[in-house]
Amino acid sequence: MLKKNIFLFLIFSLVFASVYFFLNKDYKQKGIIQRVESQDNLPGGHFLLTSQDGGVFDSRSSDKIMLLYFGFTYCPDVCPTTLIKMADIIDRLGKDSEKINPIFITVDPDRDTVKAISEYLGAFHEDIIGLTGTKSEIDKVAKDWGVYYEKQPIKGADDYTVNHLDIIFLANSNGDFIDYFPPKIQSVLIVEKIRNIINK
């Protein structure tokens, strides 16, 4: 009986934690969307971070528009799904993809080394630029872009995951916000938006 009660308690705790993290993430996601729609303190800005080849990536040094996503290499679901979408966008753009910088910025700088990011992104598309930095550098960029992220311990394991905003941003070469794309937006619609900007 005691074992059964303990088992039920663990199941309940797991369900409660899952629901809490989902609702919390959904709340934060809606927050950035409301901020964009109200045009109040739009996300955006330049950044100077370490690229997956060990060099320095300065967003000011490029005249390309940016397709920007914040995630981490240990992410079990949303990051791989979004990076597959980004790879599809690049392929659909064809030669026009040369006019954009598809960028992945880690929100887990403690684990996401240059090597880890390079190997991880290699599974999706060679054109995706992976960036990392110190925690303070990542905090600064995340704040500028209105991206929340927080470590969450994994119950029963000496490990953690990272809850984070699941949105793709589109910005011009000045780092100014253009648009955002939540998960439900199909890649073909994002490609259309990018082409409209490129061909203006």
Kindly label every feature range from the protein language model.
Residues F47-M66, L93:
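A short beta-strand-turn-helix
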Residues L83-V141:
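Structural microenvironment flanking redox-active thiols in thiol-disulfide oxidoreductases
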Residues M1-H46, K200:
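N-terminal targeting signals for export/organelle localization
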Residues E137-K193:
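Thiol/disulfide oxidoreductase modules built on the thioredoxin-like
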Residues G44-G45, I65-M66, L165-I167:
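Short loop/turn microsegments at loop-to-beta-strand junctions
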Residues S59-T82, M86:
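Short active-site neighborhood of thiol/selenol oxidoreductases, capturing the structured segment around
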Residues K193-K200:
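C-terminal alpha-helix
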